[in-house]
């Protein structure tokens, strides 16, 4: 999984 993508989702959630 992509790290920046995970961080992006974390920001939304």
Curated annotation (Swiss-Prot):
Residues with PTM Leucine amide: 13
Keyword Membrane among UniProt keywords: yes
GO (cellular component) term, any one: extracellular region
Chief site of localization: secreted
BP terms from Gene Ontology: defense response to bacterium; defense response to fungus; hemolysis in another organism; innate immune response
Compartmental location: Secreted; Target cell membrane
Alphabetized GO MF terms: lipid binding
Keywords for this protein: Amidation, Amphibian defense peptide, Antibiotic, Antimicrobial, Cytolysis, Hemolysis, Immunity, Innate immunity, Lipid-binding, Membrane, Secreted, Target cell membrane, Target membrane
Magnesium is among the record's keywords: no
Purpose: Amphipathic alpha-helical antimicrobial peptide with potent activity against both Gram-negative and Gram-positive bacteria, and against fungi. Mainly acts by causing perturbation of bilayer integrity of both neutral and negatively charged membranes, probably by forming pore-like openings. Also displays anti-leishmania activity by damaging parasite membrane. Shows hemolytic activity. Also shows cytotoxicity against cancer cell lines. Strongly binds to lipopolysaccharides (LPS) and its lipid A portion.
Assembly, per entry: Adopts monomeric helical conformations when bound to bacterial (anionic) and eukaryotic (zwitterionic) model membranes. May also oligomerize as homo-dimers or -trimers in Gram-negative bacteria mimetic membranes, and from homo-dimers to -pentamers in Gram-positive bacteria mimetic membranes. Adopts an antiparallel dimeric helical structure when complexed with LPS micelles. This dimeric helical structure may interact with the lipid A domain of LPS.
Family, as annotated: Belongs to the frog skin active peptide (FSAP) family. Temporin subfamily.
Name by which UniProt lists this protein: Temporin-1Tl
Organism field: Rana temporaria
